[in-house]
Amino acid sequence: MKKTLCKIFLLSVAIGMLGQPIISQAKENVVVMIDPGHGGTNLGANPTGYVEKDMTLITALAMKEELEKYQGVSVYLTRNSDVELSLQDRAQMAKNVNADFLYSLHYNMSANHVFYGAEIWAQSMGTNYAKGYSQGQLLLSEFITVNDIFSRGVKVQVGKSGNEYYGILRYASKLDLPAVIVEHCHLDQAFDAEHFNTVDKLKQFGRSDATAVAKYFGLASTSLKVDYSHYPKPNIEPPTQPKTQDLTPPELATLQVTEVDSVNKTVSIQINATDRDTGIMYYSYSTDGGATFEPLQIWPSATDTLTIRVPAKFGQNRSAIAAVFNCYDGMALSSPVNY
């Protein structure tokens, strides 16, 4: 397996290794470009009546409003209305104002509608990777603390050509512009629904985004009475080789019956799972031989084992199977165990 470490002005197109924490120090004026994803006929994710293009704009406007409460920062938007823009134009807008960072805001959806949580996509190479990974960690930390969102981590994805898989990151890289994609949560998963079901919650994501940006750049705000000029941000060393995604599933997933409780009619089953590259993120299990599976649950960090307790129907043959998923949603199935 390959090793991975799992920002209102509308502009015209005419006019891109964990170390010791370092102290954020604001330059004389920071320039941030916030990109509300999608727009126009490009709706984005809309699985349950929510439309991503509208949600990203609400979040972006709130992010801009909050960031402008800080001194020493100029904040721009790629769009402030429902218009369609190409990914290349969005990156070029950021470059035209000499942005220090481009933040592409999104809400997520998975192909099988089973995953949940927030994730950050960073560029895969050099100083842009280091900046994106550091900023991504601060963003996720805010989401965990303020929004109570599960973190899916900071990730990279490289296409078959060896360039960035995601267009906005690819065009930003060509312009030597640091950028991240911020996927705030999943719109197609009930587990995340409570985090995006009101306008104020969408705005809160924007405020969290702004706080993470302020911490990254070491900004201060008189009105908010905060000063992040000495905030310790993650120190990420630029990689000598491009980072790549984890394309392999977890190495191990096994089951073992550890207890049969005939009084309460339950069986305890231990799940053992490992993924040395990106770690185990979710697990699920079936008690009908794989015909149906329970909703995904969060795998406890820093452990290779957990125990589930399932109902037992004595006199009937039952078969349990576990499914475990790593940071890149790679899945491994255990062999069945009868009980």
Model-identified regions with their sequence ranges:
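Glycine- and acidic-residue-enriched helix-capping/strand-helix junction motifs
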Residues: G44-I58
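Bacterial N-terminal signal peptides
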Residues: I8-G19
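Long, low-complexity serine/threonine/glycine- and acidic-rich segments characteristic of extracellular
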Residues: T248, Q256-Y339
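Catalytic-core environment of secreted peptidases
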Residues: N29-T48, Y103
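Bacterial N-terminal signal peptides that target proteins for export
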Residues: M1-F9
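Sec-dependent signal peptide cleavage junction
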Residues: Q20-E28
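Active-site-proximal helix/loop segments of hydrolytic enzymes
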Residues: E28-V31, D54-E251
